[in-house]
Amino acid sequence: MFKHVSKLTSEQIISLEAPLMYKGIQNITFTEIDIEKQGIIEETMLKMLKSRYAFYDKDNKKHPSILLIKDDRIKTNQIDLMNELYNNKKIQKNWALIVYNGDGIFVKLPQHKNIEIQKNESINSTLQKIKDLYQESIKYIAIISGDLANRGLSFVSTDYSWHLTHMIMCASNSSTGTNLMQYSRLCGCYNDDIPLEMFTSVDITHELFAYDNLQERCVEKCEDPLLD
């Protein structure tokens, strides 16, 4: 039920402050890629290997690069992408690959590593199991997802110590700012200083920052005493 307010004043608006540990769009490094280019995901993952990231959590324990690939909505294509990536020997050797969609969880670990994952396992418990078994040896994790990688889902381990560090956003350039912001699962509350990086197109980057600025202006306007 909605209550109609004939005259809204600034005193009736409660502004909620973001937690100090919150990382938003302004805290993310954006790297331009051609999201239409064939093989751009594989190319980006190989470049990440060359960067030799070394991350540590708040307890100074190793934290892997965890990449979310927000790509095709068609579930069979997500499995095809995982298999295609796994056929690359460098990726097969270094990356743990996860598909997370409405059909469940599908996992391929680097060579000579095994894990027992139930099909209906949550992404959080899956990350936790990998952490418990292979924290010292698995340095790269890629999660391929579609519609499930939207607002309301946090890609973190159950103990909250592992979280996303990178994202490839291959959304349509015609996507609205609202949708793109909901796709941006890198945003969140993290109790460490691990840098966050988004790989996407120039158009999507501009749209995200434009929408973020619009939100800021709306908040400032609502807090303006002249509203009265």
Regions found by a protein language model. Give the residues of each.
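Conserved C-terminal RecA-like helicase domain
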Residues: 19-150, 160, 173-180
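Long, low-complexity intrinsically disordered regions enriched in Ser/Thr/Pro/Gly
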Residues: 195-204
